[in-house]
């Protein structure tokens, strides 16, 4: 299976499917999307059809209302998208990514503490 690279709209639908945690109908996905963005039912239907063709979701046609489920986990999609973003935006440099993320002082003290622990864990794994 290839690395998933969903569009922004496809990613919004995947977030809904991951949140619901079970196969969902177009109507269920549409209702959830309406909470944050005005989206037509037919648009959601068309996007899910395209996503099925792209192997981002699987369509279960055993019931009258087809149900859709993601074919990739949220961490797998995040990892794939991050690798592409890192390469395209920061020439593959994790240092430049972190430097940029921390440059505007948006990280809270708690987040900085957690980041420090992650760095220590990464260093420990490298020594082994």
Describe the function of each predicted region.
Residues 8-16, 28:
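Pre-recognition alpha-helix immediately N-terminal to the DNA-recognition helix
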Residues 17-21, 101:
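Short helix-to-turn junction characteristic of helix-turn-helix DNA-binding domains
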Residues 45-49:
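Short, hydrophobic-biased segments on the C-terminal half of alpha helices
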């Amino acid at each position: 299976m290839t690395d998933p690279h969903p569009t922004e709209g496809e990613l919004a639908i995947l977030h809904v499917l991951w949140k619901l945690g079970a196969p969902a109908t177009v109507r269920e996905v549409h209702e959830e999307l309406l909470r944050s963005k005005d989206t037509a039912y037919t648009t959601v239907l068309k996007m899910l059809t395209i996503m099925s063709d792209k192997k981002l979701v699987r369509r279960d046609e055993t019931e009258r209302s087809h149900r859709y489920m993601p074919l990739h986990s949220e961490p797998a999609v995040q990892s794939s998208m991050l690798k592409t973003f890192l390469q395209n935006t920061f020439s593959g440099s994790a240092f430049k990514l972190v430097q940029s993320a921390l440059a505007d002082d948006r990280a809270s003290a708690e987040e900085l503490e957690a980041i420090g622990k992650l760095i220590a864990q990464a260093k420990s794994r490298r020594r082994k």
